[in-house]
Every structure is written in structure tokens, then in C-alpha cells.
């Protein structure tokens, strides 16, 4: 059944939101302020889902998608929306999370951190599938809401030279003896070279290896192989094992990593984010700082250039070992210490055992830092870090943890804002600042009063 809708807003799945007698209608393919005709494709008691068939009144924020696969490929969902409007939607999602979950408003909204809208994705997991009906191998992202692989020959969010490899990769995989036993290729773009991690379910032949080597020479890539679980990951040639690194030039740091290590997808934004976090923390040279969920030391090492001591804590000993090596390479080993701990199961006694921290940076995965927030809330006022900067990749868990820090721990939210780490997607990265005992208080909503 087709109906006409006026779109009020957009959700993070890029669906326009309309209302009919108070019931939410999520309209795929529609943008705010548009009037569209759409088919209802699903009915639920509390909402309905519709798909746009025609646009009666078009939004001034609608733009022509750059990618020919947009609409089919699940890698991007907002290419049809002006980039400024994309950021505004993410900012609203952040503010809504604080209001509805944390029961507070943001007293000072930080200007959004933005970088290039295209060619920014330096990490990617590409699916591979041999499609007999099409007579070819597909290499790309999954189709939206599907397990099928998009039939794509270019990708504008990947660096251009990686996009240019999509068709040659198809041809390469199609030439291998196990062309139907390769489910994915992970891409990790470093400063000097690009690593391709090939997941293969059966052994490669000598001829296959020759093919990989020839591709490596033509495209300046290094191959890594994974035959089973994560512990089977290895470089095709051992002498290339240490070729990946990224630079943090404002701190004079070179950060080595492996293709399976977590690094930020967007190098441009990562540099801006580190600088912003350090500026907000305002660390003094006599202060002791904690960096929780420190990973490879992405924040730890820059912090060590200004602090008296930085303690980096992470759940993976592999990552903390690499962080320690990087600190030593930059003569920062005297100012850094690393510990391997499960930060999802910490308590206040654990926190006290680490000693007092003047400042703290928290950069958790999507699950957030619930246990850490609870532990901080139980500290006495004199034991607390005076300032916390929280970097988040999930506005819901950030808001949950913020509620604990503010309503139970006596902290004040002083500022928060979005970081557009993933343009053209619904992913919301953000940064928030909390202060103990001073600073502008977050304004509680009526529900929290």
C-alpha cells in the first residue's frame, strides 16, 4: 500500500522518520523536509517501515551520491546527504543520548572534528565470493542488510589506489587454485606500504604463491595469510613482517602495527582527535595520567610527551607489549608503564591499587566502560582524577557511563561533541570531558531532578 509522508528527521540507519497519528514510520530513501510517496513494507504494533518510490518535494540537503554502488552496497548509507547535514544528524544523536539515557544536557557543544569526506578509510574488511551464475569473483563490501557481496569495481571511501585494486584483486583471486575457498581480504594501509590479509580455507599452491608475489610487485602491497584462527596469521614473507606503521607527526612518533591490530580507520581524524584529547585534558608536566583501553599506545605515547608518567592499560598483552616496544623506540620508556587487565571487570579496589591519577583518558570499544565508571564513582572526592576525557564510538554507552560519572560519582560534564571518523555512515564517534569539583555543570533534565 502506497502512502504520502512528510519527513521530520533522519535516524542513524539513514531512514527518514515520519509520523502518522503518533506512530513512527521509518522511510528508506527519504531525507528530512522531503515529501515522498512510499510503499509500506513492514508493519509492527509500534512502528512501520516504508520504502520511497518517488520524491514529491526534494530536500535542499540531498546530493548526488558519488559511488555507482550506493543504495546497494552496505559500506555507506548517507552519500545522498550533504556532509554538513550528516554531521548535524550525528550531533543530534549524541545530544539525544545524553538527554534520554544520561538525563542531562550538554553544557558546551564542541565543534565537530572533520576531515576528508572521501578516500579516508585506511582499514577495511572486504568480502570475497565466487559467483558461478555471474561467472566471476566479487570483492567488496556486503550489500546492505544482506550476506551477498556487492558487485563493485570502485569505492570512493577507500584511498584511490586501494579502490583501483578492486578489479585486479578479482582477477587475482579468480586465477588461484582455491578461488572458491577465500572468504575475505583485510586491507591495512600504512605510510609506506599496504598489507592485504588473505583468509584462505585450503592451502595455497606454489603457483598461487607466485601469483601473489607478482601482484605484490605490481601494486606495492605485502601479503599476510590466515588459514584458520587468529593465531595462524603470518606474513607471506617474514622479512616484511614489520613494514606497517602510521605517523603522528605533531608528536614525532612512528607507530608500528600488524594488520590484525586495532588502529583507527581514519588517519586524518585520528591525528586531530589525539590533539583535541590532549588539549581537553590539559596535562601538566608534573601530572600522572591513566590511559584506559590504550591499545597500541595511540594516546599513551603522545601523552607521555607532556606528562610526568602515563600508565596505559589494555586487555591484550600482545598490544601492550607492542606499545612498550614503541615507547622504547622513542625513549619514552621511563615515562610510560603498561598493564594488561580486563577493564570490563574492574572495581574500586583495583583502581585504588594503581595509585592516584591526576587525569584520565578512556577510549573503550562499543561496549563502553561501565565497570570503570562504577569504580570511579566509588572513589572519594580526593581520590578522583580531576579531569576525564572519554572518547567513544557508541553514543548510547557513552551516555550510560556519563550518567554514572555525573549522578553517582559527582563529576560534571563540561563539554562533548562529535568526531566524524566515518563520513557517509551512521557511525557516531564522539568525545566528552568530565571534571571533578570544578567546571560548568551539565544541566540535568527534569527526569533526573
Question: For each of these PLM feature ranges, what is it?
Answer:
Residues 1-69, 338:
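Terminal RNA-binding accessory module
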Residues 6, 12, 203-449:
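Rossmann-like S-adenosyl-L-methionine
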Residues 18, 33, 76, 394, ...:
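Residue-level signal for inorganic ion chemistry
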Residues 30, 39-43, 127-131, 188-190, ...:
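Short beta-strand micro-motifs enriched in acidic
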Residues 37-39, 125, 290:
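Hydrophobic beta-strand signal
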Residues 53-65, 71-182:
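Extended interfacial segments that mediate partner engagement and assembly in macromolecular machines
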Residues 148-183, 189-193, 202-227:
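Internal alpha/beta scaffold segment
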Amino acid at each position: 500500500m502506497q502512502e504520502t509522508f512528510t519527513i521530520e528527521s533522519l535516524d542513524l540507519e539513514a531512514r527518514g522518520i515520519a509520523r502518522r497519528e503518533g506512530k513512527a514510520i521509518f522511510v528508506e530513501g527519504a531525507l528530512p523536509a522531503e515529501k515522498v510517496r512510499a510503499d509500506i513494507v513492514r508493519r509492527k504494533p509500534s512502528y512501520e517501515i516504508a520504502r520511497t518510490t518517488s520524491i514529491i518535494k526534494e530536500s535542499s540537503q540531498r546530493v548526488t551520491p558519488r559511488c555507482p554502488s550506493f543504495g546497494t552496497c552496505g559500506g555507506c548509507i548517507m552519500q545522498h546527504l550533504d556532509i554538513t547535514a550528516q554531521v548535524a544528524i550525528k550531533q543530534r544523536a549524541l545530544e539525544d543520548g545524553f538527554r534520554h539515557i544520561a538525563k542531562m544536557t550538554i553544557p558546551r557543544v564542541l565543534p565537530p572534528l572533520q576531515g576528508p569526506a572521501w578516500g579516508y578509510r585506511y582499514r577495511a574488511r572486504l568480502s570475497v565470493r565466487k559467483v558461478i551464475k555471474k561467472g566471476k569473483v566479487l570483492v567488496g563490501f556486503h550489500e546492505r542488510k544482506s550476506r551477498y557481496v556487492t558487485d563493485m569495481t570502485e569505492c570512493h571511501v577507500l584511498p584511490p589506489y586501494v579502490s583501483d585494486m578492486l578489479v585486479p584483486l578479482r582477477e587475482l583471486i579468480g586465477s588461484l587454485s582455491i578461488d572458491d575457498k577465500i572468504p575475505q581480504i583485510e586491507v591495512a594501509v600504512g605510510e609506506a606500504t599496504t598489507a592485504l590479509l588473505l583468509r584462505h580455507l585450503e592451502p595455497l599452491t606454489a603457483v598461487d604463491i607466485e601469483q601473489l608475489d607478482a601482484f605484490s610487485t605490481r601494486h606495492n602491497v605485502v601479503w599476510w595469510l590466515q588459514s584458520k584462527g587468529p593465531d595462524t596469521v603470518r606474513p607471506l614473507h617474514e622479512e616484511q613482517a614489520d613494514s606497517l606503521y602510521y605517523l603522528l607527526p605533531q608528536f614525532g612518533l612512528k607507530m608500528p602495527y600488524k594488520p590484525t591490530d586495532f588502529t583507527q580507520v581514519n588517519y586524518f581524524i585520528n591525528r586531530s582527535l589525539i590533539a583535541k584529547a590532549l588539549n581537553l585534558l590539559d596535562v601538566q608536566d608534573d601530572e600522572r595520567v591513566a590511559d584506559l583501553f590504550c591499545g597500541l599506545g595511540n594516546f599513551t605515547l603522545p601523552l607521555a610527551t607532556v606528562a610526568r608518567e602515563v600508565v596505559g592499560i589494555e586487555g591484550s598483552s600482545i598490544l601492550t607489549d607492542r606499545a612498550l616496544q614503541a615507547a622504547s623506540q622513542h625513549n619514552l620508556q621511563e615515562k610510560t608503564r603498561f598493564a594488561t587487565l580486563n577493564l570490563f571487570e574492574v572495581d574500586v579496589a583495583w583502581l585504588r591499587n594503581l595509585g592516584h591519577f591526576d587525569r584520565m583518558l578512556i577510549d573503550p570499544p562499543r561496549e563502553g566502560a561501565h565497570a570503570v565508571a562504577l569504580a570511579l564513582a566509588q572513589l572519594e572526592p580526593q581520590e578522583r582524577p580531576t579531569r576525564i576525557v572519554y572518547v567513544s564510538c557508541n553514543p548510547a554507552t557513552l551516555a550510560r557511563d556519563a550518567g554514572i560519572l555525573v549522578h553517582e560519582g559527582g563529576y560534571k560534564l563540561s563539554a562533548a561533541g562529535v568526531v566524524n571518523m566515518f563520513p557517509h555512515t551512521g557511525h557516531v564517534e564522539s568525545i566528552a570531558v568530565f571534571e571533578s569539583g570544578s567546571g560548568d555543570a551539565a544541566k540535568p533534565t527534569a527526569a533526573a531532578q
